[in-house]
A protein has these predicted regions:
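Cytosolic regulatory modules rich in charged/polar residues
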Residues: 1-95
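Hydrophobic alpha-helical transmembrane segments in multi-pass membrane proteins
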Residues: 53, 70, 92-96, 100, ...
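Residue-level signal for the membrane-embedded core of alpha-helical transmembrane segments
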Residues: 54, 93, 97, 121-124, ...
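Alpha-helical transmembrane segments of multipass membrane proteins
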Residues: 60, 101, 105-108, 127-132, ...
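Membrane-interface elements of multi-pass transporters and channels
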Residues: 69, 84, 109, 113, ...
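Short, non-helical or kinked segments that cap or interrupt transmembrane helices
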Residues: 89, 111-123, 136-142, 159-162
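Hydrophobic alpha-helical segments embedded in the membrane of multi-pass proteins
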Residues: 97, 101, 119-128, 147-149, ...
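Hydrophobic alpha-helical transmembrane segments of membrane transport and translocation systems
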Residues: 141-198
């Protein structure tokens, strides 16, 4: 990055080097991208960007479609989703918020635990909690799939996981309150902030 005309900041005793100016697109780049062909690196970066967009918008759009615009879904998917959401005790917004909170708790617990316990805790915790919650009628199977895809997609860019979690919850609240209009409005505000930030 220094060869691209940027400045570097090194602090004595810290293993981290900062380069200035910082651009958001840097988070989608990996050091492995420089050791493969340009086509492979481009495909990897596009895949990371797509995964981040999915991590942000999947829960919010699922809730917005379920609450306000269920007819947007294709007929086959509509039948599957409507069969999975019958007799649920939670509203779609609360259901998704509950599942995202459980996902964050599982991630935090697996980070704090020793390595040999963390894997078992995360796998068994996710399987047991997910299966029990579906059988108890608290959550639906499509919601668990959406949250799992969103959680996995967020870790394609590990440096952004904290930010993605906060923005994902904000988009979920906007979708639960005014539907797709809320998602579009909040997305426009986020893009405005990113463009005007120094």
């Amino acid at each position: 990055k220094l060869l691209e005309g940027r400045a570097g900041v090194l602090v004595d005793g810290s293993p981290i080097a900062l380069t200035l100016p910082y651009m958001l697109i840097e988070d989608f780049q990996s050091s492995q991208d420089y050791f493969v062909t340009p086509y492979r690196a481009t495909v990897s970066r596009i895949l990371r960007m797509t995964a981040v967009i999915a991590a942000l918008f999947l829960p919010a759009l699922y809730v917005a479609a379920q609450l306000f615009k269920l007819q947007l879904l294709p007929f086959g998917l509509l039948m599957t989703v409507s069969g999975g959401i019958q007799d649920l005790s939670l509203s779609p917004g609360l259901e998704m918020f509950f599942l995202l909170a459980v996902l964050e708790i599982l991630i935090e617990a697996s980070i704090r635990m020793p390595k040999y316990v963390a894997l078992a805790l995360s796998v068994i915790g996710a399987l047991v909690l997910g299966d029990t919650a579906v059988k108890a009628g608290l959550v639906s199977s499509p919601a668990i799939i959406i949250v799992a895809l969103s959680g996995i997609s967020a870790y394609t860019v590990p440096d952004l996981t904290g930010t993605l979690s906060v923005v994902r919850i904000a988009l979920l609240l906007a979708a639960g309150s005014i539907g797709t209009y809320g998602v579009v409005l909040l997305t426009a505000l986020i893009l405005y902030y990113l463009v005007t930030a120094d």
